[in-house]
């Protein structure tokens, strides 16, 4: 029988922000956007903020109406990536196989390791304590015979708990839980189930698989199996990303093309950081523009494989100028990289400017990985925080 762990870092973004600024502890903290931005949604919020009815994906304006005294933050995304990697590094010391589901979620397969770690529950407590002691990050851990059970268990354990469902006890554990507890049950499916008088997971198990197959097709069959405690007992192998992209939606539609280029410069730096972390080069650069009237344009160009910020940014700017032919304010801008190949560093007897620059960018990447993305800012155009003007750096 498989033994699958699901580790979920509790209110991860908030936890990292509290490490950066301990004064935030005990306060309602909302990460995602600030009320004055106009647009944006809640990416994460503390348990103190949830007492006011806030939740992820809530529009920031609505969140502010419910919790005007909360602390609203854009988020320190470079730090989130750094702490996520640090957690994964700890887990890799123990888990034979890991599947990272998101920046704050990890599946681990500990099948066949009881003779090494003993009690799985006590081992989970040890793992939980090590992450707290070394990184100050609270987490919840679910343990079950498959991924679905482990995921539900970690949600059940929040905050900072551990839930272990022994093999053979899955149906009994699931029966009293609301049907929306099953991963993948969204609003539409929930409404359909309620219309059929199905409110608890146990209600699903009282009916046949064929009933759900007829009502909802293959998804209905999968739902029935999950309700009966069945699920994937193996983890997905790491997959190679097919693209790297970053986008920025403006709080207010932007018509200053200098500021738009400055945004593109920042986004280029972020995607190139990810590119070098993978030790890849890109051969296709794309940009995306969405105007205030929601007309969306994309442009792409194939280039010689590179991981050089300057080359990629210059390509992106040319694409921007080709795409931006309308005298309309811009709502969103994004950059997209595809067609990857492995980076192979070659020793050069005589180093040209591009080679020196590439080495500099790789050094910058290492520093940002260690101290956070904002540790080093590369200058081209800096927009002051009040958006009243521009400063050019040489």
Per-range role (PLM):
Residues 106-112, 298-301, 345-350:
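Short, hydrophobic beta-strand segments
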Residues 6, 181, 189-330:
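DNA-contacting surface of Y-family translesion DNA polymerases
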Residues 305-394:
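Acidic, metal-coordinating catalytic segment for phosphate/diphosphate chemistry
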Residues 1-222, 235, 273, 354-394:
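Gly/Gly-Pro- and Ser/Thr-rich, intrinsically disordered tail segments characteristic of DNA damage-repair
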Residues 25-27, 68, 137, 283-285, ...:
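A generic structural signal for short beta-strands and their flanking turns/coil linkers
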Residues 101-105, 144-147, 280-284, 328-332:
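Short Gly/Ser/Thr- and Asp/Glu-enriched loop/turn motifs at secondary-structure junctions
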Residues 110, 143-147, 227, 289-291, ...:
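A general secondary-structure junction signal
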Residues 12, 35-38, 292-295, 340-343:
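Short, charged/polar surface micro-motifs in flexible loops or helix N-caps
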């Amino acid at each position: 029988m498989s033994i699958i762990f699901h580790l979920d870092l509790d209110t991860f973004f908030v936890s990292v922000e509290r490490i950066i600024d301990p004064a935030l502890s005990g306060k309602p903290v909302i990460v995602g956007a600030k009320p004055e931005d106009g647009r944006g949604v809640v990416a994460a919020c503390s348990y103190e903020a949830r007492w006011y009815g806030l939740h992820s994906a809530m529009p920031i304006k609505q969140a502010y109406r419910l919790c005007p005294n909360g602390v609203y933050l854009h988020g320190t995304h470079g730090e989130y990536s750094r702490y996520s990697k640090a957690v994964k590094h700890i887990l890799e010391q123990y888990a034979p196989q890991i599947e990272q589901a998101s920046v704050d979620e990890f599946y681990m397969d500990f099948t066949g390791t009881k003779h090494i770690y003993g009690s799985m529950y006590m081992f989970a407590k040890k793992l939980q304590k090590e992450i707290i002691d070394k990184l100050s990050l609270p987490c919840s851990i679910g343990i079950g015979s498959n991924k679905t059970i482990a995921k539900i268990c970690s949600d059940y354990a929040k905050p900072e708990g551990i839930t272990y469902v022994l093999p053979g006890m899955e149906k009994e554990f699931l029966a009293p839980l609301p049907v929306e507890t099953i991963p993948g049950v969204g609003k539409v499916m929930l409404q359909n189930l309620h219309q059929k008088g199905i409110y608890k997971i146990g209600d699903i198990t009282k009916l046949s698989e064929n009933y759900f197959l007829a009502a909802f097709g293959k998804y209905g069959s999968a739902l029935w199996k999950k309700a009966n405690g069945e699920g994937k007992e193996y983890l997905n192998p790491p997959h190679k990303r097919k693209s790297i992209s970053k986008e920025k939606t403006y709080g207010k539609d932007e018509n200053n093309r200098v500021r738009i280029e400055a945004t593109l410069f920042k986004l280029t730096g972020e995607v190139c950081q990810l590119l070098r972390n993978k030790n890849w080069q890109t051969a296709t650069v794309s940009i995306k523009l969405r105007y205030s009237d929601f007309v969306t344009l994309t442009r792409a160009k194939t280039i010689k494989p590179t991981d050089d910020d300057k080359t990629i940014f210059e390509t992106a700017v040319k694409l921007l100028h080709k795409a931006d032919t309308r005298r309309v304010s811009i709502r969103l801008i994004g950059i997209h990289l595809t067609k990857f190949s492995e980076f192979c560093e070659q020793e050069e007897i005589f180093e040209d400017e591009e080679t020196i620059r590439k080495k500099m960018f790789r050094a910058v990447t290492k520093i940002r990985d260690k101290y956070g993305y904002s540790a080093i800012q590369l200058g081209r155009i800096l927009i002051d925080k009040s958006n009243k003007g521009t400063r050019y750096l040489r």
